[in-house]
Amino acid sequence: MTDSALDRTLVARHLRFQTNGRYLTDDVSLELNCGEIVAIIGPNGAGKSTLLRLLTGYLTPDDGECLLAGQPFSHWQPSALAKTRAVMRQHSGMAFAFSVQDVVAMGRSPHGRYPKNDDVVQQVMAQTGCLELATRDYRHLSGGEQQRVQLARVLAQLWHPEPTPGWLFLDEPTSALDLYHQQHLLRLLKQLTREQPLAVCCVLHDLNLAALYADRILLLHEGKLVAQGSPADVLQAETLAHWYRADLSVGSHPDYAIPQVYLRQ
């Protein structure tokens, strides 16, 4: 891998993480490249959120290594890492009263006194449909509104005046969103990965959303990476029925050459 390619890649090798004698992540190796969306799927308890925490540096593996742009997380200065890697957790509550605009502006804190911070906040709020929420108390928003605000925050965190490699990690970002906002969020992420050197890695339970928007899919089961590849490679009826233990079928999307998953009654 060339130096320029290395600068745009996160590499995980043989990651293992255990607790109470049980491996939550077991010998997982993968790459996340700028310019793509990667979806992590799998049944409940598969280890999806644990893997995400290992890939972001919030957990240290018992074995294996994770290199962001060629460097282990321990070699990164916190301020530089915060401007390169952003994480949207599954639940992001606030104990105190902050306006939506204040929450989004928190994403700019690693950038110090950049003169256009306010402009960046307005831009990402517009992109995520949060402008009309700007003065609202974050604590009083619906779950879906809070998810949109948190997306704006992490986009603000990774915004740079010049194209700069970045990695965005999202844990179930569509779980509280209605259909319109699911589509809007994932279309926005797709657009950003095409326009910027940005890698997006997200945990998704909706397999059809993963098929529509992900460039690659990683299927986990009991901490192991049991399948990876394009949506067509991974979302096959036999594979999904085996690992999800569900009665299902897989067909084709009416408009695109991608699979769609259907549950049987």
From Swiss-Prot:
Domain ABC transporter: 10-247
Residue runs in coiled coils: none
CDD domains per UniProt: ABC_Iron-Siderophores_B12_Hemin (cd03214)
Pfam families in the record: ABC_tran
UniProt keyword ATP-binding present: yes
Membrane topology (UniProt): Peripheral membrane protein
InterPro entries xrefs: AAA+_ATPase, ABC_transporter-like_ATP-bd, ABC_transporter-like_CS, P-loop_NTPase
Broad class of the protein's primary localization: membrane
Gene Ontology molecular function terms on file: ATP binding; ATP hydrolysis activity
UniProt keyword terms in alphabetical order: ATP-binding, Cell inner membrane, Cell membrane, Membrane, Nucleotide-binding, Translocase, Transport
Binding site for ATP: 42-49
Annotated localization: Cell inner membrane
UniProt GO cellular component terms: plasma membrane
Quaternary data: The complex is composed of two ATP-binding proteins (HmuV), two transmembrane proteins (HmuU) and a solute-binding protein (HmuT).
Family: Belongs to the ABC transporter superfamily. Heme (hemin) importer (TC 3.A.1.14.5) family.
Protein's recorded name: Hemin import ATP-binding protein HmuV
